[in-house]
Amino acid sequence: YSGFNFLAADHDELWWVSNRAPAPQCLAPGVYGVSNHLLDTPWSKVVRGKRRLGSLLRSAPAVEPLLELLADTSVADEDELPDTGVGPERERLLSALRVVSPAYGTRCSTAVLVGGDGRVQFAERAYGAQGEERDTLRYEFRFSD
């Protein structure tokens, strides 16, 4: 994967940029999804993740349920697989929110919550090559003016 997606935020704005998109984009409030393609590419895992994220955000948002969402290893049904040119078996492997594979897979997942008061909760969970959970780092801080 030679492309990248990058998010930058302060207390007021969230920006997304990719080396595959024509220009940076300031994101309006809402639920977005990103994988190894452009923002909101309608791959099954992006659509599924956005739906679950929206549901989590309607309740009392917390970091742990977000990390659990990102840890989902269920794969898409055959008819929901995209055709990115890697073949059906690989498409199936890559259709999980958390890809488990020794050669190529999810090595960390990050959840960030920003409250209206500027309080930020940041957590990152690391995984080994066999998919085992390694550790979780947690930080809390406030955006300053």
Placement of each model-derived feature along the sequence:
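N-terminal nucleophile
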Residues: 1-145
